Structures are given as C-alpha cells and as structure tokens.
C-alpha cells in the first residue's frame, strides 16, 4: 500500500505534503480557530480540505492559497466549498497579505497546516504583514513551536524566538502525533496561535537592524556578545545598555536585543547628502 496516496492524491515531497486525517485533531484545531461569519479567513495550503471543510461550513466565503495545481483544481470543483472559495493558486511566499487585507476590507485571520520545509521562511514573510493580520493558527513541527515560544537561557531560544516574539504574542494550542497524518511525518507536530501585538512592547526604529544583530549573534551563539557583536558594540556600550558583555546570544532577552538595535539607529553616522 502506498502511504503517500490519500483520497486519490499522491503527496508530493517537494511541496512537503502531509495530509491531516484525524477527526478529533481536526475538530480541536477548528475549535481553537473559532471562525465566524464575516471574518476574513485565509487558509495557506488547504491540501485535501481537512480544515477547509469544517471551517468553510461555518462561513459564507473564505480565501485559500494553494501552490499545487491539482489540489487547487479539486477545491474549485468541491461540491459545497467551491462556490464559497476564492482560490489563489500560488506560493504563499509571493502573496501580498496587505493587499489581500485591503481587498477584503479587514485584518486577516490566517491559518493552515504549513509544509514543514518552508514554515520558518513563510512565517518571516508573514511577520512583515502583521499590520494586516488579526491572528494566525498554524500546524508546525513541534520543534519549531518550541523555538517560537522559547525564552532566554534555553537551547531552543534563537533568532526565530526573538523575531516572532517581537511581532506577536505566541500561545501553544495542542500537540499532534505523526499518526494524525497521511503519510505520517517522522516528527511530532503542534498547533500554535500567533497574535500580532496591538501595541509593540519594545518598538525598534529599524527592523533590518534588529534582524542583522540577531543574525550575527545567533550565527555565533557559543561566543560571548563581546566577541560576536564586537565589531558593532564596545564593552562600555554594552555595559551602558545593561547587557553583560560575557553573556551569549541565548542569554539576551527580546527587550535587550531591541535596545541594541535602537542604539545603532540612534548613533548611526548621518547619511551624506
């Protein structure tokens, strides 16, 4: 028996396809999302409609983004979903979510069982549109969820933790075993809720600076900050900002990374006219 075939569709490895088929898990996810009529619900990677059907039952219309043309075609001809769906057959990484929000006239509620091979870059793409997003619910590799929620002084804490927590409040919802999917992935999964901050707790002046600092620090996470960020900050500056130069990347809080980023923005040499 070919375990990569589900409902007549061959799961494609290059799209990272694993189809959810556990009814209890599906109902738990839909209950956590709690979709309401009139909301701008957007599903990324609907696949064989395991979540699309129960969510669609509660709505008059919804938007889906599906890269696989065969699956997009199946959705278009779905007996009850078809007329309710606006289908974008494209890569979600190329989607302008701000334009979509403007078109739908309200912030988006985004959800999906994300392909694990693109989940991290896709979340970074979505973070750049948090002004247009009300909330997000995603099925992810459990290890990625652990990184999203991790705090300082833990192995899981990294650049993804800092950037995700800069943009959003992050709430784990439930854990999902491999047996809930066809084909069964080799990893544990989990559902997470991300709610963009209405007011940024630690606003930075230039996001690209925060992104650069966290990349530099975590690329050399075993080094002390005095060494990994030594080209940017002197020991005196670190001390002045309340950051021990002997700390490593994983010891520094989101708030402290934001302080470092703002220091660079405030002290950058003026641009030549």
Swiss-Prot record:
Keyword match Transferase: yes
Predominant location: cytoplasm
Catalytic activity: adenosine(1518)/adenosine(1519) in 16S rRNA + 4 S-adenosyl-L-methionine = N(6)-dimethyladenosine(1518)/N(6)-dimethyladenosine(1519) in 16S rRNA + 4 S-adenosyl-L-homocysteine + 4 H(+)
Residues that, per the record, bind S-adenosyl-L-methionine: 18, 20, 45, 66, 91, 113
Top-tier EC class: transferase
One cellular component (GO) term of this entry: cytosol
Keywords assigned: Cytoplasm, Methyltransferase, RNA-binding, rRNA processing, S-adenosyl-L-methionine, Transferase
PROSITE patterns: RRNA_A_DIMETH, SAM_RNA_A_N6_MT
Stated family: Belongs to the class I-like SAM-binding methyltransferase superfamily. rRNA adenine N(6)-methyltransferase family. RsmA subfamily.
Official protein name in the record: Ribosomal RNA small subunit methyltransferase A
Protein source organism: Enterobacter sp. (strain 638)
Gene designation: rsmA
């Amino acid at each position: 028996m070919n375990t990569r075939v589900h409902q007549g569709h061959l799961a494609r490895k290059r799209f990272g396809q694993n189809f959810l088929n556990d009814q209890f898990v599906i109902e738990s996810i839909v209950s956590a999302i709690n979709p309401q009529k009139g909301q701008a619900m957007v599903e990324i990677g609907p696949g064989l409609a395991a979540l699309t059907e129960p969510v669609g039952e509660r709505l008059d219309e919804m938007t889906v983004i599906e890269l696989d043309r065969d699956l997009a075609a199946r959705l278009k001809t779905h007996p009850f979903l078809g007329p309710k769906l606006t289908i974008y057959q494209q890569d979600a990484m190329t989607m302008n979510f701000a334009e979509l929000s403007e078109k739908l006239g309200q912030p988006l509620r985004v959800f999906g069982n994300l392909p694990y091979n693109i989940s991290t870059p896709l979340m970074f793409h979505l973070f750049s549109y948090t002004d247009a997003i009300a909330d997000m619910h995603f099925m992810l590799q459990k290890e990625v969820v652990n990184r999203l929620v991790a705090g300082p002084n833990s192995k899981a804490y990294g650049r993804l933790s800092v950037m995700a927590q800069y943009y959003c409040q992050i709430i784990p919802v439930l854990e999902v075993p491999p047996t809930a999917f066809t084909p069964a992935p080799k990893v544990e999964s989990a559902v997470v809720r991300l709610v963009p901050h209405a007011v940024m707790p630690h606003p930075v002046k230039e996001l690209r600076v925060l992104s650069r600092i966290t990349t530099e620090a975590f690329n050399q996470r075993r080094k002390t900050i005095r060494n990994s960020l030594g080209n940017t900050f002197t020991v005196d500056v670190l001390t002045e900002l309340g950051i021990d130069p002997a700390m490593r990347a994983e010891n520094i809080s989101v708030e402290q990374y934001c302080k470092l980023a703002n220091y660079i923005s405030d002290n950058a040499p003026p641009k030549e006219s």
